[in-house]
Structures are given as C-alpha cells and as structure tokens.
Swiss-Prot record:
The gene is atpE. F-type ATPases have 2 components, F(1) - the catalytic core - and F(0) - the membrane proton channel. F(1) has five subunits: alpha(3), beta(3), gamma(1), delta(1), epsilon(1). F(0) has three main subunits: a(1), b(2) and c(10-14). The alpha and beta chains form an alternating ring which encloses part of the gamma chain. F(1) is attached to F(0) by a central stalk formed by the gamma and epsilon chains, while a peripheral stalk is formed by the delta and b chains. It is a multi-pass membrane protein. Belongs to the ATPase C chain family. NCBIfam families: ATP_synt_c, PRK08482.1. It comes from Campylobacter lari (strain RM2100 / D67 / ATCC BAA-1060). The record marks 82 as: Reversibly protonated during proton transport. Keywords: ATP synthesis, Cell inner membrane, Cell membrane, CF(0), Hydrogen ion transport, Ion transport, Lipid-binding, Membrane, Transmembrane, Transmembrane helix, Transport. It comes from the Bacteria. This is ATP synthase subunit c.
Length: 107
C-alpha cells in the first residue's frame, strides 16, 4: 500500500507539469504497450508452435503412414500461428510510428 501511495505522489508532479509533457507520456506508454503486446504475442505463438510440433510428432509416432499429411497440416497451422504474431508486430509498429492517439492528445 505504501508503494502505491508513493508511486501516486511521485507521478502527481508529472500530472501537473507543462502541456507538452502529454506527448512524452503518450510516446512512453506506446513503447511500453508495443513491447508488452509483442512479447505476449510471441510467447503465445511459441507455446502454440511447440504444442503443434509435439502433436505432429506424437501423431507420426503412432501412425508413420500419415507423416506426410500431418507435416502438411502442421506447416499450415504454423503459418497461421505465425500470422497472428506478425499482426501483433504490425499493430505495435502502428502504435509506435503512426500513433492514432496523437490527434486526441493535440485536441
């Protein structure tokens, strides 16, 4: 509780600072959100890819005759998983360089 109160008191100086500081806050939170969002997306993608590969290896071990079909399906699934991470990267780049919230701060 003491840490939260100290943090709020420490940040209150920034809240009453000059008008131009809002752009700095927006930039810093955009960088934080982009990094955090991309990190979570990459973590989820890595877990999904690991589960996909494990399931494909287990399926091939059970029935070696289906190995080719399982590999094809696995590559399609991996491409779909990786596409989600690339979408997160695009959103992070938009938040960093073409920030749509810039107009709200200027108003």
């Amino acid at each position: 509780m003491k840490k939260i109160v100290f943090l709020m008191l420490a940040l209150s100086g920034f809240a009453f600072a000059a008008e131009g500081s809002m752009n700095q806050w927006l930039a810093s939170f955009s960088i934080l959100a982009a990094g955090l969002g991309l990190g979570v997306a990459a973590l989820g993608g890595a877990i999904g890819m690991g589960n996909t590969a494990a399931a494909t290896i287990a399926g091939t071990a059970r029935n070696p005759g289906l190995g080719g079909k399982l590999m094809t399906t696995m590559f399609i699934a991996l491409a779909m998983i990786e596409a989600q991470v690339i979408y997160a990267l695009v959103i992070a780049l938009i938040a960093l360089y073409a920030n749509p919230f810039q107009a709200l701060v200027a108003a």
